[in-house]
Design a protein with these regions (language model features):
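Bacterial N-terminal signal peptides that target proteins for export
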Residues: 1-9
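Extracellular/periplasmic carbohydrate-active domains that bind, remodel
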Residues: 20-497
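Hydrophobic h-region of N-terminal signal peptides that target proteins for export
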Residues: 12-20
């Protein structure tokens, strides 16, 4: 397939950029101090500039803690952080730069460069909680101008660990990224990105995403272990002419107090040719998979093959919406297969420092959702070889949503809302809720409810072309006589055992 040929080229470019004529330079030879106290920003930047101007190579950090503010990686330079070495962020918010091109703040930037990278078994640690809270203190003193919405500085004013903007041929491998003050690592309008073997611990402050890929093409992310307070593997588009394509994520683990695989929420441009393989998701508050287009984006040709989701609040949430008047998002040609998921009854991330919000209105456990809006249906979605175990125990005295025609048609669209599976609070099914969709296929889908649930297993409303092949519904014996598949305004429905 074309996508895999493109991705093979990325691997070749990544290898070439790391070995072609590379020379090693020790950061300490330039005068950098690994004492955990000295601010090394100017020395590290001078070293990077020298290496870039003299044919490129690796700036090696060996043994100890190197404190720095914002630094910029230049053409043909790789930061190599050995095991036992750390790049530590300065605790002074004024030591970080908000770059005028990227319009973000970061500890490590690379802006409009080629053949850049970060490698090694060491650590980059922004010490984000301390930086962010000190930033709030400075704001109260009048030293930083910010409205302090939600009692914190705006995301772009808090430093990320890494930010690459309009770069080509990026390699980031092996390192540990810890404690950003905002998003963790952002790749914006870049090409040819290779990310391998990262360990991410990003739960020190609000908005700690694991990785954000924004309008990028030709990307490989593999063999990573991410633990994040916010969305983990996050794909965004910030511009109407933006394009994200040819992206592979494989052999990765994620845990989140939000979502793990997440398209959005900024979705203005196009997304196509995405592949996810062999994913493990654990202890996640929201969804294992969220694919949402709510700002006008076009999402097509996405395949998720091989996913295990344990102790996660919702397995699958597919959504179109319309937050921007006049935009016409669409989503089509989505395949999700070879999935096993278990949904708990209790809140999966309870007790985490930045756990997902406790909801103020009651609901029973939500089903997986395939939810378009009128005129913008989900198109050509296939679920194959899926097994999901739900807890049941729904109590209609706690929250209730019936499945009569009138009750289904009274469910609000919420097309302008931020896309989360729990927006509707109570939904009328325990397994799958399908609404405003065309060409939906379930093949060898098995759903089990462990305890009694007053709702049917599957509700489909306003669907054209609903094809069930080998759908198996397992329920407590007390519910055997209850109708388990409810349809309203469904055309061309086939249910083949």
């Amino acid at each position: 397939m074309k996508i895999f040929k493109r991705l093979a080229l990325i691997l070749a470019l990544a290898s070439a950029s790391l070995v072609a004529g590379a020379k090693d330079y020790l950061a300490t030879d330039f005068g950098a101090k690994a004492d955990g106290e000295t601010l090394n920003t100017a020395i590290i930047q001078a070293a990077i500039d020298y290496i870039s101007a003299n044919g490129g190579g690796r700036l090696v950090f060996r043994g100890g803690d190197f404190v720095t503010g914002t630094i910029y990686i230049k053409n043909d330079v790789t930061l190599h952080i050995e095991a036992g070495a750390r790049l530590l962020g300065s605790l002074n918010p004024w030591d970080y730069v908000r770059d005028p091109d990227a319009n973000w703040t970061s500890m490590v930037f690379s802006i409009k460069q080629k053949n850049v990278g970060i490698t090694g078994k060491g650590e980059i640690n922004c010490r984000g909680f301390l930086v962010a809270t000190k930033g709030v203190d400075y704001c109260h003193l009048g030293l930083i101008d910010d409205p302090l919405k939600l009692d914190r500085l705006q995301e772009a004013k808090r430093p990320e660990n890494l930010h690459f903007y309009k770069c080509e041929n990026i390699t980031v491998t092996g390192i540990t990224l810890r404690d950003p003050a905002s998003w963790n690592q952002q790749y914006d309008k870049c090409r040819n990105i290779y990310v391998d073997g990262l360990t991410v611990d990003a739960k020190s402050y609000w908005n700690n995403d694991g990785i954000d890929i924004v309008d990028c093409s030709d990307v490989i992310i593999r063999n990573c272990d991410f633990d994040a307070a916010d969305d983990v593997y996050c794909f965004k588009s910030h511009s109407k002419d933006g394009l994200s394509e040819n992206i592979l994520v494989e052999n990765c683990r994620g845990r989140s107090s939000a979502n793990v695989i997440k398209f959005g929420t900024y979705t203005l441009g196009k997304f196509k040719h995405f592949r996810f393989k062999n994913m493990l998701i654990e202890d996640t508050y929201r969804s294992a998979i969220t694919i949402a287009t709510v700002d006008g984006a076009q999402i097509e040709d996405v395949e998720i093959d091989g996913l295990r989701s344990l102790h996660t609040g919702n397995p699958i949430f597919i959504r179109t919406g319309s937050r921007r008047p006049g935009e016409n998002p669409y989503m089509k040609d989505i395949v999700i297969k070879n999935v096993y998921a278990e949904v708990p009854f209790d809140k999966p991330d309870a007790g985490d420092m930045y756990e997902g919000p406790v909801e103020d209105l009651p609901r029973n456990v939500c089903p997986s959702g395939i939810q378009g809006i009128p005129g913008m249906p989900i198109q050509n979605l296939t679920l194959e070889n899926i097994e999901i175990v739900y807890p049941g125990q729904a109590d209609k005295n706690y929250a209730y949503r019936g499945s009569s025609k009138a009750e289904l048609e009274a469910i609000p669209e919420l097309e302008k809302s931020y896309p989360e599976f729990s927006n509707w609070k109570e939904l009328p099914a325990w397994g799958f809720y399908i609404r405003h969709a065309e060409g939906i296929t379930f093949k060898n889908v098995k759903i089990t409810v462990a305890g009694e649930d007053y709702r049917p297993a599957i509700v489909a409303d306003d669907v054209v072309g609903l094809n069930f092949q080998g759908v198996q519904i397992n329920q407590p014996s007390a519910d055997k006589k209850k109708k388990q598949i409810v349809t309203n305004n469904v055309k061309k429905f086939k249910n083949k055992k």
